[in-house]
Amino acid sequence: MCIRDSATLYASDNARANLILSNPFCILRTVGSGGKINYERYFAPEELDGIYTPVHCPDSVGTAPLEGRNVVVFVMESMSAEHSAHLHPELYADRQVKGYTPFLDSLMQAGYCFERMYANGTRSIQALPAVLGSIPSFKTPFVLMPQALAPTRQLPRILRDKGYATAFFCGSAAGSMGFGAYARSAGIERLYSREDYEARHGRDDFDGYWGIWDEPFLQYAGEEMSALPEPFFAALFTLSSHHPFVVPDAYRDLLPEGLTRNHKCVAYTDNAFRRFFARYAGEEWFRRTVFVFVADHV
């Protein structure tokens, strides 16, 4: 992991992160490393603006007043439309198991479901910039590029400027995959990781590979969300449907096997969401919250 991604964990803004990185170690580490990006210019900026511009400015017609609802974004590890019988009923027409996401399928039918929403990233490290900042994937993951410390206007920062509390949850170790560092640079104030979970609930729920099992970590996240000042924005990255595709012993015989090893893990995470909703649906903050579910990559 590039050291600049960790610097933002210890700085209140990206400018101070750059100051942290202005030290002899970083100079020696990067001498001769290259990495310069050649910006080819095939058109003059004015000419290109006349052909196409990626800049879109909001107008009053398409802008609704901010209602101050809480927003929770679940970024789901290795999730795919093919796991859902609601999205792909033809895959399960002649099979005993009707998909591996029955709870998420029920939410799709009760809420808004976007059936043609595609990721152009292939790794978890590319997910948060895309989901929280609308930043596309490049050959080099954005969080490893020098541009990651450039000023950006991303959803958490926009909402924080509107008075929202902001939080990010991931059951992996603090600093893993640059998630926490990126979340901090995107404007998120509160970070919750494996260490925070274990400080309260002990170490029995570590999966032995990546972090805390999804079910107990989602329950913990709900506890922390209940204590956040409203309105709040929270993003949560799940883990349990990642390779090597294991589930807790208590669920080994309770979940469908599927055609591949990850299907049982997907079913486990789906059940973890079901239990999260069952526990917190009666809370006042829950009824004032918009929940968004999105996969991390293709």
Question: What function would you assign to each model-found segment?
Answer:
Residues M1-D5:
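Conserved small/polar residues in nucleotide/adenosyl-binding loops
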Residues S6-V298:
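Soluble catalytic regions of membrane-associated enzymes that act on cell-envelope
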